[in-house]
Every structure is written in structure tokens, then in C-alpha cells.
Amino acid sequence: MAKQLIYSDEARKAMKSGVDKLANAVKITLGPKGRYVVLDKKFGAPTITNDGVTIAKEIELEDPFENMGAQLVKEVASKTNDIAGDGTTTATVLAQSLINEGLKNITAGANANHIKKGIEKAVAAAIDEIKKIAKQVKNKGEIAQIASISASDKEIGNLIADAMEKVGKDGVITVEEGKSSETTLDVVEGMQFDRGYSSHYFVTDTERMQAILEDPYIIITDKKISSMQEILPLLEKIIQTGKSFMIIAEDIEGEALATLVLNKIRGTLKVIAVKAPGFGDRRKEMLQDIAILTGGTVITEETGLKLDKATIDLLGQAKRIVVDKENTTIVSGLGDKKEIEARIAQIRKQIEDTKSDYDKEKLQERLAKLVGGVAVVNVGAATEVEMKTKKFKVEDALNATRAGVEEGIVAGGGVALLKTQTVLEKINAADSDEKTGIEIVLKALEGPIRMIIENAGLEASVVVDKVKNSKDTAFGYDADNNEYVDMIKAGIVDPAKVTRTALENAASIASLILTTETLVTDIPEKSPKFPGGGGMPPMPEY
């Protein structure tokens, strides 16, 4: 395949054009008065969103050289979203400013690699300062503030704060499309896994179609149970205690299932049978989680334990079990607290060590089940288009909140970035080009606050100067209410992790673009013209 190449200023100019096209589409969404972008879809209604990464992902430019620039800035938004879950628009604004200012100086003859060194020095100093000024999140009110600012909606902020309070910072909070126009929160306490009863004959509450047991024993095994003889000795021991019980096994079928159902209908046994959750190695780990949570032992031949020889002390216990057609919930397992804490610590370590996003997600789900429970935010709206828009907001707010809890919060509205300028002014540069790199970062740090104010329809320069000259690190401008305030006290905050990640990723991609000298891409193929269609020959003239 033949290639086309462009060099030096021409290459950088093409990339800059692509960067600007993407960034200009994204940055209008920044701040409380930012606007929306409508994304056309080949099928169905268009998507209306103010989520930076969602907009960036949709943009592909016709010119291949311009598209390279756009795709690199898209990478800034995607990486920031992957790490921090929010701050994608801020990252894009920072990247555009760093690239534009850097290219001006390189075109004027500055050394690109020395500028890069200056940018790296300045960004490292700014990030250290962000970490220093970060304030730890201590209460539900501060959690609500983070979520409210991210979503530009106090109702969503309060809902996420409620969810986090109920399931803890490690708990699973999922966002789903609701069935009404109201946004609601459902919390499932205890451990829940996605396996329902093996037969509807186990149901005890016919109105809700749920099977409920109080203070039951729990048999946990990785075996497939088909013969009643395998579990009969253990059942006789349980019957003597007068307690109800649940069986969690790979499968319960044939004679064993029929006998359990028959005895349940007759009232001889209070029993529920469910299949074990997960598959393969993950199933083994989940059964072990259930065993530790309930104080039981997984009955498996791998450890030399057999069902027909099992004793009562191998069984788990819980205060309550609720099983419906699709899910099983174990409430208040009676496991040893120290063992549960050790298991939690082990899973946390695995989360840190794993490099697979899928494995990390599954480990976090397991952690949440052990720690506290699962909260579901059901997003409600009048139309499907509005629901999708609102769902993006809730997901961003949830990610921002988690980031805030993790690394603390800083003054929002672009103020934290602006205030780090004082640290950058003290950096010693090796030469004039490195100093230029530091000055490029100094100017870029004003980008987000300028954009927020411009999107609110105001003149940015006056506001930026006033905020910059104040010695109070929390002093800033509330663009929503058009007034100067203490940003922390006013609840206008950003997660430190989001601010830090946005700056790191913007600087990383900007440095790559600034040190680029050649662009190589395929020569676009010209599609052949279709030959003219057949038809009648021309009629003779008379």
C-alpha cells in the first residue's frame, strides 16, 4: 500500500487543525452553563450529551493527517475517563492549550525536546501541589457536593451520597435505566448473587414469588447433587435441630431435587436449593466468599470433604435468606469478622495487582458483596433521549465521587489548577526553551477556568486576574450564580484524582504532538466510477 508523508511545520499544522476541531466540539460543554452536543446515530434518535469522552469518541475527520491529531486528543479524554471516570473535557481543554502554545514556539524556532522537558517539570510540580492541597472527604454532605457538581444536579448528588452511605465506599453502585420518570435508589443489603431457586415449589411468599428462610443453615458444595443418598445423612442431622436450610451446589437435579420439593410441599422440610454462582475458578472463589461470610466450609473433594460424611459444623449460617426467580440474597452472614476482614484485604490486594479491567471489575463486585451490599440507581426520565443523557450524567457523577473519596477534593471551577501557578513560577529552568515549556504550562492552567467563564457568557480575563491575585487557595468564581465565593464552602469542588489525571494525560499527549516531525498515512484509494448503465440506442432523427 503506497503511503503519503508530510513533514515539520506542515505536519504540525495539520495535527493542530485536527486537535482544534475535536477540542472545540468538546469544550463548549465545560462548566455549569456549558452547552450540549447532539450526536447523530444511523439508527434511532440522536444522542444529546455534555459528556466529553462520549463526544470525542464519535469524532472521525475526513483528512487523515488532521484525524491523527484528533485521535491523539481523543486518547487524552479516553485515558482520563478510564483512570478517573470524569474530567475528560478539562483534559481536552488543557491538551489544546498546551499543543497550541507549544506549536507557536516551535514554529518560531524553539527546540521541541527542551520545551517538552519544561512541560514535564512544570506538570510534575503542579501535580505535587494538587496532592498537597487536596482535602479528604469526611462526610455525606461533601460526597453529595462532588456528585452534584459533576452532574450539575443536586438531586443526583444527594442520591449518590445516599447510595455510598448505605453500601460504603467499596460497595457496588450500578446505574440502570428506570421504568418511570423518577430517579430512584434501591439498596440490596447483604451478599447477593445472580442465581434463583431451582424450582418455584420452594417459594414461601407467593405474592412476591420469593422463598424466604429465617436463621437457616447453608450447605455449600461444588458438587452436582442428583442422588438423595449423598445428602441424606446431613439432612437427618439438620432435621434434628429443627432449623431450615439452603443448599448451594453446582446443580441439584433428578431424584434429589424431586425429594426436596416433595418434602417442602408436605411441610416436612423448610428448604431452598440454588445453583452456585459464577463459572470455573471464579465459582470456587465465590463459594469460598460465601463460606467465609456465613462461617461455613466449602464441601469439596479437593480438600477431602464428602457430602455423605459432612457434619453440622461445616455448614454456614445467616440471619435471613431471600431467593427470587433470578437472585439469592444472604443477609447478615454469621461468619468470623476477622476471617471476613482478611478475605476483604486479600481481594483488595488482587484488585491492585491485576492488569485486566474485566478481572478488576469482577473482583470489585466480590469485594462489594463482602463489604456491604449493592445499590442500584434507577434513572428516570420522560423520554428515552433524556434518559440516556441523564444516565451519562449519573455515571460521571458516580465516577467523580469515587475519585473524590479516594484522593480527596480540591477547589472546583478550574481554581485548583490556576492556583498551582505560584509553584511553577519558582522552578529553575536549564535554558530558555525549557523555561518556555514551563510558561506554556502556566498559560494552559488558566484554560479550564477561562472556558467555564466564557461558556457562562462572561469576559474571562477580569475574573481570572482577580482569582489569580487572591492569596486564598479556595477563592474562585461561581459561574452558575455569577459571584466570587469560597469554592470549598460553596460546595464547588473537584476530585483531586480527576484534576491530577486530566493534567497528566493532557501533558503526555501534548508532548508527543510537539515532538512530532513526520506524519505517514495511506494514500486514499479512488473508488472507480460505475460504468454507464445499458439502455435503448438513440432514436434516428427524421
From Swiss-Prot:
Its main location: cytoplasm. The keyword Isomerase applies. Signal peptide: none annotated. One of its GO terms (molecular function) is unfolded protein binding. ATP binds at residues 29-32, 86-90, 413, 494. Together with its co-chaperonin GroES, plays an essential role in assisting protein folding. The GroEL-GroES system forms a nano-cage that allows encapsulation of the non-native substrate proteins and provides a physical environment optimized to promote and accelerate protein folding. This is Chaperonin GroEL. It comes from Endomicrobium trichonymphae. The lineage of its organism: Bacteria, Pseudomonadati, Elusimicrobiota, Endomicrobiia, Endomicrobiales.
